[in-house]
Amino acid sequence: VLVVAHPGHELTLAGWLTTVGPSVFVMTDGSGQLGRSRLHSTTKGLLNAGARPGSIYGDFSDRQVYEAMLKHDVDLFLRATFELADWIVLDDVDYVVGDSAEGYNPMHDVCRIIIGGAVELATRLRGRPIGNYEYVVTGRRDHCIAGRCAGTIRLRLDDAALERKVADALAYPELAGEVDAAIRRDGIEASRYECLHPVDNRMSWTPAEGGKPHYEEHGESRVASGKYQRSVRYAEHIAPLYAAFWENISECLDAPAASRMVGASSLQMGGRQIRPS
């Protein structure tokens, strides 16, 4: 299973997608501030690669998830976690791959805890370990390119596969400009290597003392320019969201009976019931 925050992230793992043909969960529709989904471009690419959409596929707009963060609405993210855990168990998944938490975009970071929570729940339900891997979304990939990643799943694309990967990325209309800029900055060879790094289920990104995540600085500039009314902040929004999320997951794991029910109005596992706001 591959789990990404936004459509288009899968382009980074084009070789792995073609090799494995996983189910792909896309949390948001990629509509951004303009409100235009780019999900159809991802669907076309997945089908060409032999992959398939998962049960969560652009279910939320970017506006919805940011509003949930601002309102501390952990229920939205818990619902996604339970649904992903359900799929992992029913599809007998061996390992899950997803966005890394880098402090770049809050949804990337929240996607990481959704994956971690789902893997923990699915492991409890199934009774055997499930692998959890991340890949670099926006950060530096120097160690991957140099082959210095410890304990990773590492793919090196041949020339034909690399050419297809780059061509497909440039043909993704909504992201072609970003792809072209990345190629000019890093070179085509940077796309040859695809590395999946094992990660702890409860891993989360935290800023250095006195520092701010990229998304906080970006949000502040948007507020100052009048484009946003409020911006997502780590200490005010994301850290409390993490705490509430893991409190709920821990209660589920600590419950005496491992039962789960998913419905339109409630989620339950081990007797813990969460009602959507």
Residue ranges and their predicted role:
Residues V1, L78-S277:
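Metal-dependent de-N-acetylase/amidase catalytic core
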